[in-house]
């Protein structure tokens, strides 16, 4: 429906400048993508697949590792462990005892077909909790807290991520009481350091489980447990996880500049003191307080650049898909622009998810929305891996290089380029508007 915007001598400039109805465009693109996907899947199935590799283990496949630990859990001879590689958890296989049985390959979320669903086939809701105290401690609208709360009072255990104040790491924990829910509140912006260790606790749990995780973690653990009735999966809208080395560099910066010490440090990655959309990061420690907006804070600048994510993040399979029952995140876009305390985007992907949301909807303002809001305002395609990726990861591992030097070398040039392009677009739009106005005056 955009053929009239192809430029030729008979096209009037004011027609080209008219606003495009992107909702209509995106709906057409979504239908065409689905057709293409079905065609490719049918072609693959018709071909019958390939023979199993002789070396049938995850380390012999040219696929990224997200550190979920599913392979480690199913290995019958404990040949796999999760090593730290450049600040990321990564599977390592002991070839001396590996049986090449293929069990690790079968559960790897990056190998084989996924039983995931398209986000566009889900039901989109907005959610904002009625309890102001819940909103203030939550990164957005409080939906994660409310899901966990409802789970606890219904007799479930909750698996989620907390920030370890002593080790400055994100950790996945299992909680059993309402008093522990606040440990899970707030964004972490780090890869969980022990997700692989929680799988055994899920297996041994004597109650139903509500399990929060990144899309790749959920995909991995679901390959182990499947659609068991006693597990509800909730994945998070995820842009990527930075290297733990970013946090190490960041704390060295806080220590050097502001006198922080590595002991009992609380970090609010999304402090709402100036509002939900402002995105401040605040650090607290025994009377010391550091607080800065994202465009000036070194941790945020590195995270937002997208230059130091895990290799797996650049090949994510779940930007517009999910293996979970519910997906949650911030409701970005124009619909709630100006909201001070936060609103959640909630995508219901299954009947189990719908039943859970139905139980909690009266705790807040829960409204049906158009799924196109997700496709228009969330990151539905992978970010490009920078050509200097190996270099920046190496510099992050180098103790003699500061976080300021890394930002100056890699991030600042791109920030300047983006700022220049933004200015040029504004000037161009202003000139075009003046030309249209001038033409209209002459015609009169």
Identify the meaning behind each predicted range:
Residues 138-142, 165, 211-221, 240-242:
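Gly/Ser/Thr-rich loops at beta-strand to alpha-helix junctions
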Residues 226-237:
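A short alpha->loop->secondary-structure connector
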Residues 103-144, 148-150, 410:
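Electropositive, gly/pro-rich neighborhoods at or near active sites that engage anionic ligands
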Residues 44, 61-66, 70-92, 102-120, ...:
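Iron-sulfur cluster-binding cysteine motifs and their immediate structural context
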Residues 2, 6-9, 16-74, 78-81:
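Ferredoxin-type iron-sulfur electron-transfer modules and their immediate structural context
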Residues 241-251:
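Short, charged, surface-exposed secondary-structure boundary motifs
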Residues 154-157, 255-444:
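Long, compositionally biased charged/polar accessory segments in the mid-to-C-terminal portions
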